[in-house]
Amino acid sequence: MAVKEESRVRCEEITYKQYTTSDGKVFLRKSEADVHAGLLQWSDAVRNFGVKNTGGAYHCRTEEEFNAVVNMIAYENYAYDCNERKFVPQNYYENYKFSGDDWYFFFHKSNMDYPDEYWMETLSQKKQEFADWLKQFEESA
């Protein structure tokens, strides 16, 4: 996705640059426009793969689909990096690996005074946890 740069004049003395992405959104910072263009690229990739999405869960059949979803989420969660002085994608799920054809849930918990928590679970894991929990009651009955 290309980012188009334009110069505009607000008054005779004030000029500024604005950056327009392919979906028509306008940004005043190039790095923010670049991150949004990356989001559009990864969103298109996820859509082209045919990944099903419902309520924050994604059904990934291949590792390539899983990586596209993780990258898309990274571009959704961009932040300003003071050291680099630009907006950058935040990939909190890069340490998680593809574990086969499954539904993947990506969670984020905001902690006021502590670092935020990010984790991923699969539907198979949740089913196994529920089966184990149910089994303890069936055994004691």
Predicted regions and their residues:
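Residues at or immediately preceding the N-termini of alpha-helices
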Residues: 30-32, 63, 127
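Short active-site loop/helix that positions an aromatic residue
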Residues: 30-44
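Short aromatic-glycine-(Arg/Gly/Cys) micro-motifs in beta-strand/loop hairpins
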Residues: 3-24
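A short, exposed loop/beta-hairpin motif centered on an aromatic-Gly-Thr core
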Residues: 22-30, 57-59
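Acidic, low-complexity, intrinsically disordered interaction modules
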Residues: 40-44, 48, 53-56, 61-125
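Ampiphathic alpha-helical segments that act as solvent-exposed interaction surfaces
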Residues: 1, 112-141
